[in-house]
A protein has these predicted regions:
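Alpha-helix-loop-beta-strand connector modules within alpha/beta enzyme cores
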Residues: 81-98, 146-156, 307-311
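Histidine/acidic residue-rich metal-binding segments in metalloenzymes
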Residues: 114-279
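His/Asp/Glu-enriched, well-ordered alpha-helical/loop segment
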Residues: 177-205, 272-273, 277-279, 284-350
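Metal-associated gating/positioning segment near the N- to mid-region
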Residues: 29-94
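Divalent metal-coordination and catalytic microenvironments
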Residues: 28, 39, 60, 64, ...
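N-terminal metal-binding scaffold of metallo-dependent hydrolase/deaminase domains
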Residues: 1-25
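C-terminal cap of metal-dependent C-N hydrolases
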Residues: 9, 294-297, 318, 345-393
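Active-site mouth loops of central-metabolism enzymes
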Residues: 38-51, 74, 100-113, 131, ...
Length: 393
């Protein structure tokens, strides 16, 4: 990892494959590694009215990302080579950035029968049923054994459906004050506990999606201390907001929900001590109509690729919570390391001093629903570079 200013960039021999022109850029712009997001929803095939691989890639470029991993809640679900090829062909046709698909754990993400894991393994980054937790202990154990035999990770959306009770936001102060049904923290951490037992039994490499609770941090920290091969991610929104920041607006609805201040502080501590390995956006665009029905009626999911770095830089780095180097580890280095990718000649040029207000009208994504709209941030993207080539943004 290296962070350079433009004037240093101009004199180094490290970037031999760079074919762009930066001589006119200000010397105090920073050159950062291209980010890697292991958790995005690009909606193609099946839901192109929400997002396409092309619009999602443009959104990623506009946030300094050069590699993304796309979740399998598509139509058709990539549970067979035939279905996966539809997505692979669309990715190849776009070709803007590195887009790597997940294969599903189960057929149709229904949790009842394993996908054609062996057939699709060579073409996917890992296996996940993100959007749904695998409810059956036996099914998850079978999936872990199969993934281990294929040297692939299981990437788990941890959610025990039996504990949801119709909830749609965190079961905390805001829910109680405003008569909303809450989702308890146990719905997340109880399934993490179950999965860790299965990981110990099977020896699979295991990664937990979007952790949001203090208990999840504590459980994963303990598992790491015991030598379990486990990594995890959290999202920018869980590090910046607590449930008292909620508004009855669909742009504050996602799964898992924004939780308490105690949870937020525990997540930050997990970032600082290495329990949490990476930050992923869970970029999940929907149409305006699908996000315009308040907290109760809107679909889960927010967009995040274009706001992640400025939000985190402003709220964590400029405030002294973590260093810029640590943030780069979380957004660029650790994700690639865990999933066996290399950085190559990918980087982005940032004006870290620029202050501006986030406006969803500026997003390249088809989705415009963001809890960060209206916030003032520092860190404006100037250029994104993939394999030494400046990308149009």
């Amino acid at each position: 990892m290296e962070i350079l200013k433009v004037k240093q960039f101009k004199t180094t021999n490290q970037y031999k494959n760079f074919d762009g022109e930066i001589s006119s850029l200000f010397d105090n712009y920073y050159i950062l590694p291209g980010f890697c997001d292991v958790h995005v929803h690009f909606r193609e095939p099946g839901f192109e009215y929400k997002e396409t691989i092309s619009s999602g890639s443009e959104s990623a470029i506009n946030g300094g990302y050069t590699t993304v991993f796309t979740m399998p809640n598509l139509k058709p679900v990539p549970d067979s080579l035939e279905n996966l090829n539809i997505q692979l062909n669309a990715i190849k046709k776009c070709g803007l950035i590195e887009v790597v698909p997940y294969g599903s754990i189960t057929k149709g993400q229904m949790g009842e029968e394993l996908s054609d894991m062996e057939d699709i393994a060579p073409y996917v980054c890992a296996f996940s049923d993100d959007g749904r937790g695998v409810q059956s202990d036996d099914m998850m154990e079978k999936a872990m054994l199969k993934a281990k035999s294929l040297n692939k990770l299981i990437v788990a959306h941890c959610e025990d459906n039996s504990l949801l009770n119709g909830g749609y936001i965190h079961d905390g102060e805001y829910a109680k004050m405003n008569n909303h049904k809450g989702i308890c923290s146990a719905s997340e951490y109880k399934q993490i506990e179950r999965d860790i037992k299965l990981v110990k039994k099977t020896g699979v490499k295991y990664h937990v999606c979007h952790i949001s609770t203090k208990e999840s941090v504590d459980i994963i920290r303990k598992a790491k201390q015991e030598g379990v091969d486990i990594t995890c991610e959290t999202g920018p929104h869980y590090l910046v907001f607590n449930d008292l920041d909620l508004q009855d607006d669909g742009r504050f609805k996602m799964n898992p929900p924004i939780r308490s201040e105690e949870d937020r502080l525990a997540l930050i501590e997990g970032i600082k001590d290495g329990t949490i390995d990476m930050i992923a956006t869970d970029h999940a665009p929907h149409s305006f109509e699908e996000k315009s029905k308040g907290l109760k009626g809107s679909l889960n999911g927010i967009v995040g690729l274009e706001t992640a770095f400025p939000i985190l830089y402003t709220n964590l780095v400029k405030t002294g919570v973590i260093t810029l180097e640590k943030l780069i580890e979380l957004m660029a280095i650790n994700p690639r390391k865990r999933f066996g990718l290399t950085l190559n000649n990918d980087y982005a040029i940032w004006d870290l001093d620029s202050e501006y207000e986030i406006d969803s009208k500026d997003f390249k994504s088809k989705g415009k629903s963001s809890p960060f709209t209206g916030l003032k941030v520092n860190g404006k993207l100037i250029k994104t570079i993939k394999n030494g080539k400046i990308l149009n943004i």
